[in-house]
Amino acid sequence: MSRSGTLTPFARGPGGYATALGPEPYLTVAGPDRVAGTHCSFPSSTIFALQPGGHPGIIAIGANGQARRFANLPGSPTGITADSTGRFGHMLLVTARQHAATAVLAIDCAGRVHPITTGAPAMEGGIAVAPASFGRYGGDLIAPNETSGRLYAVRPDGTVVTLAMSGLPHGGDIGVESAGFVPSGFGAGGAAYLADRYSPHNRHPGTNSILRLPGPELIKAGVHPGDLLVATEGSARTIVVHCARSCTVRYIAAGLATTHAEGHIAFTGQAG
């Protein structure tokens, strides 16, 4: 997608990417760093997408638009991100439902799966790794729980703690779902983006579009690089979380009442 909102087809040809309609195949892009305990790194410009359904896994989509199965997963995946700080060894991080609990998994550049914990509370959506500047949670995996409204921090040793209560409406298809950290160098020339998924017959049916919150509006709301933005699935009610010695939570924005937000909050970060 261009800055003007023009969409260009990608990975649509033979050998490209396709998945079933209905599930939530979140995606991420990994960095170029060497993965701990390996002799490899993730391929440049490769997208990694969750494959829900009967054979859960991760699909790798190369810059040439070709897709291949990259890893198998032991449970139903609910979120994916890449470790950019190195506290998780620069691996892919995935949350997956397993029976009554959630597993947090690290996947290396060879597609091997390493459990971090198999007893985490429910978490899903736009999970993200906190930058080192994010107080005592720097480098932790941050994940929302839509049913309770809690924001969790998962440490590399598998410990899970509550970072904050969102203070927003909570419940299935209502509560906190999407998260993203404002990048270094973010300024008036940047923006935040969030998918508004079409979900027919839902209380929040969505518009099958991409929402944009301009940089000047975020700056006016007191948002700074390194802050965490979190939005609810229903209506994209948005908070900013700032953590230093302690954490603060402020409400800053909302989408339309019909908005059905899903996935990561993504950014363009140029200063203006």
Q: Residue locations for each model-derived region?
A:
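Sequence/structural signature of beta-propeller domains
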Residues: M1-G272
